[in-house]
Amino acid sequence: MSEQNHPQTEPQLDENQIIALRREKLNNIRQQRNAYPNDFKRDSFAADLQAQYGEIGKEELDPQAVPVKIAGRMMLKRQMGKASFATIQDVTGQIQLYLNNKGVSQEVLDDFNHWDLGDIVGAEGTLFKTNHGELTVRVSDIRLLSKSLRPLPDKHKGLSDQETKYRQRYVDLIANEESRNTFIKRSQIIQSVRNFMVGEHYLEVETPMMHPIPGGATAKPFVTHHNALDIPLYLRIAPELYLKRLVVGGLERVFEINRSFRNEGMSVRHNPEFTMIEFYEAFSDYERMMQMAEDIIRNASRTVNGTANITYNGKEVDLESPFERLTILEAIKKYNPHYTDEQLNDAEWLKKEIVKHGESLPPSPGIGSLQLALFEGCAEGKLWNPTFIVDYPVEVSPLARASDTKQGLTERFELFVVGRELANGYSELNDPEDQAERFKSQVAQKDAGDDEAMHYDADYIRAMEFGLPPTGGCGIGIDRLVMLLTDLQTIRDVILFPQMRPE
């Protein structure tokens, strides 16, 4: 395609005028034939053709006259004398079409010249190379399969407005190859995680999305109402308690990749509905869960990036080396070596320091809660390379098993990478009497004004009374994992349709 030939453009009309003009074209088509035919059968994809024939020379390819049927959206269109060129885009990539009055009838050529960018077409022909070496389909027949009534974004500027990208993701996917690649990678990451779990002999399961009692995490739920039963229901904030019921039932290794919902604020790291994997393994503990989380993340990075040493926001992240492990206090002192043990166990000093770092005071007044709040304010954001923070206080870990050797602490971890939480796991509490007491403590906190404290789940206690084996469990945020592995800074860029305020 010669560079001095300029693409055809519609008249300089505003969007409403363009839509009206295109509707008129559609009405003309309707009068002549079916405007939305569904009998074109393609046999080729653009990327497959480029891979198979792109490196073959013109002299070798042209005599083969390889027949193809290809379909896609018209992204470029140029006229050169009596010939026309177009570029169409399918899910795999782009390929050029060439039409002239030797290959197609003048009637077909005239029809084609009235089609617009964005129209979806099906073309049949043979492959050849242009003088510039571009793989091209010499068209023998072409059909309009679906008329685009709205103009595409300018091909040079693309779709640059962020809010429009999120609200009209369908346009973003058409116009921006980077966005398409992000969501292809997202799918590959999820498939990588799923394959890894199956390889570890885990069973994939599905548990309820609507719960009679919200549980499995400390968060505010969305509330709905079941009309037939006349009861309130809650969109799940986590699948944990149902998955552990399955472990009680003898399904010793289970996992679920699905949505959870939390009725809380939105930010670059938070969307009200989000995807996570949770997995549970009988006769296991938090040490095994840390290794599982590490292996899952490292394997996913290798799958989509070819390496576990990646770059995020211009800075290297080492997912290849063993992940560091620190306690909450060790992490605080690593970045604040001037803090003393005496200060870190002084409730009043902790409260002042928490406020100084811009954090809210926790609803629970215990030392452990205060230490955790200080960690979030002064250390969490500095954990760049993957780091497990271990041994969380009992008061902030109502479902985790208490440590046998460390008074007031649990066998719990959270994984932080690039300054944000990516995973949470623990040795599961399997003593039903201890669990019942912790639920009661959570109810007391809720009565005292903590909206995120847990409810008392009597059925879960009943399940535990049948015997929950020693179990390890872990949850990994899929959206944040995709952000990490695609080098994107906001969660909205990795969710196809993020939550938005209505227009």
UniProtKB/Swiss-Prot annotation:
Q: What does it catalyze?
A: tRNA(Lys) + L-lysine + ATP = L-lysyl-tRNA(Lys) + AMP + diphosphate
Q: Which GO terms describe its biological process?
A: lysyl-tRNA aminoacylation
A GO cellular component annotation here is: cytosol
Q: Output the Gene Ontology terms for molecular function.
A: ATP binding; lysine-tRNA ligase activity; magnesium ion binding; tRNA binding
Which EC number(s) does the record attach to this protein? 6.1.1.6
PROSITE patterns on file: AA_TRNA_LIGASE_II
Per its UniProt record, the required cofactor names are:
Mg(2+)
Fetch the Gene3D superfamilies from UniProt. Answer: Bira Bifunctional Protein, Domain 2, Nucleic acid-binding proteins
> Signal sequence span per UniProt?
none
Q: How is the cofactor bound?
A: Binds 3 Mg(2+) ions per subunit.
Where does this protein hold Mg(2+) 1? E414, E421
State the SUPFAM superfamilies in the record: Class II aaRS and biotin synthetases, Nucleic acid-binding proteins
Domain of life, per UniProt, equals Bacteria
User: What HAMAP family does the entry give?
Assistant: Lys_tRNA_synth_class2 (MF_00252)
**Name of the featured protein:** Lysine--tRNA ligase
Q: Which organism is it from?
A: Neisseria gonorrhoeae (strain ATCC 700825 / FA 1090)
